[in-house]
Each structure stands twice: as structure tokens, then as C-alpha cells.
């Protein structure tokens, strides 16, 4: 029995953080600042909206909301 538990899809209201390895390898990283703040990688951020393969994230800080690819996000577990 090697059936694994299916991964729960990220949706509006999910708490997430950015997976640093996936982000650094992405084309979005080439077009952005290479020195992102640590809170992006530590989390939690809340998904406000999902459109196609992107999610809009709001951090618990006084900073603008940001769009990331869903494949660059991981669920935040406390």
C-alpha cells in the first residue's frame, strides 16, 4: 500500500509561505529583486485570491499584497 494522501489544493483563506528553492529557480525571480524579505519565506501569508496558476498573498505586515505562482507556495503549518 503505497498510496499517498492526496495533496490539499491551496485556496482562498489558506495560510502559506514561499518555498525558497522553487522561487529562486523561477523566471519570476529573474525579473524581481533577489533579496526578498525573510517573512516571505517564513510565513504565514493568507491567500486572498486565486486566478489560474497565481495566488494573491497578504502578509501580516503593513506591506502591499503580492502575486506568486501556486507552485512556489507551500501550506503553512504551525
Swiss-Prot record:
Keywords, in A-Z order: Membrane, NAD, NADP, Plastoquinone, Quinone, Thylakoid, Translocase, Transport
EC category: translocase
EC code(s) of this entry: 7.1.1.-
An annotated GO cellular component: plasma membrane-derived thylakoid membrane
Chemical reaction(s) catalysed: a plastoquinone + NADH + (n+1) H(+)(in) = a plastoquinol + NAD(+) + n H(+)(out); a plastoquinone + NADPH + (n+1) H(+)(in) = a plastoquinol + NADP(+) + n H(+)(out)
Membrane topology listed for this record: Peripheral membrane protein
Annotated GO MF terms: oxidoreductase activity, acting on NAD(P)H, quinone or similar compound as acceptor; quinone binding
Cellular localization per UniProt: Cellular thylakoid membrane
Family: Belongs to the complex I NdhO subunit family.
Function: NDH-1 shuttles electrons from an unknown electron donor, via FMN and iron-sulfur (Fe-S) centers, to quinones in the respiratory and/or the photosynthetic chain. The immediate electron acceptor for the enzyme in this species is believed to be plastoquinone. Couples the redox reaction to proton translocation, and thus conserves the redox energy in a proton gradient. Cyanobacterial NDH-1 also plays a role in inorganic carbon-concentration.
Oligomer status and interactors: NDH-1 can be composed of about 15 different subunits; different subcomplexes with different compositions have been identified which probably have different functions.
Name of the molecule in the record: NAD(P)H-quinone oxidoreductase subunit O
Organism name: Prochlorococcus marinus (strain MIT 9301)
